[in-house]
């Protein structure tokens, strides 16, 4: 099976690309980094350190790479059986025009066999979003063929892949042993690909929100509380018993929303929370707080990992004290190298916390919840 994967970074190589290669797919990475492309094509393999309770070194073999800005990527789309992405939400829109050109060329070449596209991004229904962007570039005359032949399959992905430490091998990547890749089986065209580690479901949103409200919420609360206390890594922060307790409580608050909304078993979800806390404390992962905390404006948006679970607590009349504290800590996030962090601090200086919070989150500036968060923001100074 031929797979084209957009994004040859650590997540692409260490997570999605690895699972596909392990399933005997012919994986071609598409990326803008010419040095990375040359290295992958020269060696056609790379090492993956899988770390956790059991450690192992895997070698991913028989891979290739092309420039995502060149003509060769179009040729790969013409013959691909599967297209996947791990480029980040901010870059996803930028590959839509390339994908549209490739699909047009595919149809012109007479290839009407099923093609499935899976965006493996930290965003809700990211593939559906990509589909709408692709349709903006694909001529209307091709839309009916596109609808019958191409499946845009939403997914939920979960694996911590920190930036690789400097070493002599630029292709080497370190990943945690845990991974989860859940796909919406109702959106595939043709047969579902058989990939160990890819789990089909007909209830994707339950798993999307479980991951967003637990892993992502816990991760970001750990980062922002850890930043306030001067820690550098997620592990350092989560080993602080005060922070660990607050992060657990925040995930319990968001978990109560999931139990109400989707009927998750409270005991099983409590065990899931404990598993995530253990993942944050993995001594073999050096996951920097500024990597997790970056782009605070995106992470404070209404549909993201802090405000969306908070809105759920308001919907169901549930407690939210520790989610509020996580949002308050986010407002304190400073990082001169992060344009969004700089913009956030400028908004706070210009508008004050209530109006700035309303601008960023969509919450009403005069609401009780904003007043409560501002009080926590002031108490953290």
From Swiss-Prot:
Keywords: NAD, Oxidoreductase. InterPro entries: 6-PGluconate_DH-like_C_sf, 6PGD_dom2, Mannitol_1_phos_5_DH, Mannitol_DH, Mannitol_DH_C, Mannitol_DH_CS, Mannitol_DH_N, NAD(P)-bd_dom_sf. One of its GO terms (molecular function) is mannitol-1-phosphate 5-dehydrogenase activity. Its EC number is 1.1.1.17. It comes from the Bacteria. Pfam families: Mannitol_dh, Mannitol_dh_C. GO terms for biological process: mannitol catabolic process. The keyword Oxidoreductase applies. It catalyses: D-mannitol 1-phosphate + NAD(+) = beta-D-fructose 6-phosphate + NADH + H(+). SUPFAM superfamilies: 6-phosphogluconate dehydrogenase C-terminal domain-like (SSF48179), NAD(P)-binding Rossmann-fold domains (SSF51735). NAD(+) binds at residues 3-14. One of its GO terms (cellular component) is cytosol. It is an enzyme of class 1 (oxidoreductase). PANTHER family: ALTRONATE OXIDOREDUCTASE-RELATED (PTHR30524:SF0), MANNITOL-1-PHOSPHATE 5-DEHYDROGENASE (PTHR30524). Belongs to the mannitol dehydrogenase family. HAMAP family: Mannitol_dehydrog. This is Mannitol-1-phosphate 5-dehydrogenase. It comes from Aeromonas salmonicida (strain A449).
């Amino acid at each position: 099976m031929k797979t084209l994967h957009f994004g040859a970074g650590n997540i692409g190589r260490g997570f999605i690309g690895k699972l596909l290669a392990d399933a005997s797919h012919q994986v071609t990475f598409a990326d803008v980094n010419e040095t990375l492309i040359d290295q992958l094509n020269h060696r056609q393999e790379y090492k993956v350190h899988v770390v956790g309770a059991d450690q192992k070194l895997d070698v991913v073999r028989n891979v290739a790479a092309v420039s995502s800005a060149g003509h060769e990527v179009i040729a790969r789309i013409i013959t691909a059986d599967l297209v996947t992405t791990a480029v980040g939400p901010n870059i996803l829109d930028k590959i839509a025009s390339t994908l549209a050109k490739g699909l047009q060329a595919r149809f012109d070449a007479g290839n009407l066999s099923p093609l499935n596209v899976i965006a493996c991004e930290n965003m809700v229904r990211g593939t559906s979003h990509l589909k709408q962007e692709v349709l903006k570039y694909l001529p209307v005359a091709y839309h009916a063929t596109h609808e019958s032949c191409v499946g845009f399959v939403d997914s939920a992905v979960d694996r911590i892949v920190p930036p690789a430490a400097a070493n002599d091998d630029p292709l080497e990547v370190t990943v945690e042993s845990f991974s989860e890749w859940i796909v919406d089986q109702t959106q595939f065209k043709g047969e579902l690909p058989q990939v160990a580690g890819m789990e089909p479901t007909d209830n994707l949103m339950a798993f999307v929100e479980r991951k967003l409200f637990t892993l992502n919420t816990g991760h970001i609360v750990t980062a922002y509380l850890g930043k306030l206390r001067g820690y550098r890594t997620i592990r350092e922060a989560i080993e602080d018993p005060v922070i660990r307790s607050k992060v657990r409580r925040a995930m319990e608050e968001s978990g109560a929303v999931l139990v109400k909304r989707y009927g998750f078993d409270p005991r099983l979800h409590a065990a899931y929370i404990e598993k995530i806390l253990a993942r944050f404390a993995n001594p073999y992962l050096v996951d920097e707080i500024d990597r997790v905390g970056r782009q605070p404006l995106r992470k404070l948006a209404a549909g993201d990992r802090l405000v969306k679970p908070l809105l759920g607590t308001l919907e169901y009349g549930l407690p939210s004290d520790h989610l509020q504290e996580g949002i308050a800590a986010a407002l304190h996030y400073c990082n001169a190298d992060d344009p969004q962090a700089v913009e956030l601090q400028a908004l706070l200086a210009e508008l004050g916390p209530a109006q700035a919070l309303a601008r960023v989150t969509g919450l009403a500036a005069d609401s009780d919840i904003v007043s409560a968060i501002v009080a926590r923001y002031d108490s953290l100074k």
